[in-house]
């Protein structure tokens, strides 16, 4: 299974990029959801503009598809500066980073996606650039090599990552602003769907937008992708308007159920229930049972199911919860109906 083939994947697709840019908000006032992040960034941006300074270096982290790139572009737009974008894997050599840094104007934003994937040698060059706005460059080779320092204009580095824990401490400590993006509520996603539909000129009833939103796994990127597919269905099999019924029929045809699960999610859960009596089962046995690679289960299938409380990782292996049985309308096994074992140490003072 290739993750990019799943309609409910939160990973970015090249074919989504053009449409995503067309519906991407450019101002904080248009940015839906993430109220704490929005309020804080509004304050920080206003303060920096009032002092006529570059915004502090900003780290944005959270699951894929929640709007890290969008927020980086909004920061540049609100600050009234240009943004140059790259990603960690692209910056292979110090020269790659130096070329970007030396072309920045005062106050500009340098956006580095997947910043946790920077190579150590590039990261070392980035430290003085972030802290002192200086670039150390080695000229020549061997005994004749010498280091020269170039002054850089004050700039803002905006780093984005889905794995903040993989950042080195020295790099993490150089960010003055750190923002975590959370999964979106269904109500906020419905607002995003209605906004995107309006930009696309697509008549959409509130109930239709809500039906799409509740199956979007808390992720705007998925919500917008589902909207485009429901638009196709409404155009061919409906009257061009997205109603709750049209959205329901379209998403059922796409095999996305009311919890946002697709065939792969349901197959994993049912395998645990039917072949392993709900678990626990080791990851390698589970991978063999559904003919998938271990890393596919760990990195692609499990995270959302764990986040929603349908699977637990235990020292003995994977276990489904009562939510999985109820989702499929199955009777709970006897062990799930038994009262919990009393804590032998309950009441003891520790």
Swiss-Prot record:
The keyword DNA repair applies. Mg(2+) binds at residue 69. One of its GO terms (cellular component) is cytoplasm. SMART domains: AAA (SM00382). The keyword ATP-binding applies. It comes from Stutzerimonas stutzeri (strain A1501). One of its GO terms (biological process) is DNA repair. Residues 258-350 are annotated as: Head domain (RuvB-H). This is Holliday junction branch migration complex subunit RuvB. DNA binds at residues 294, 313, 318.
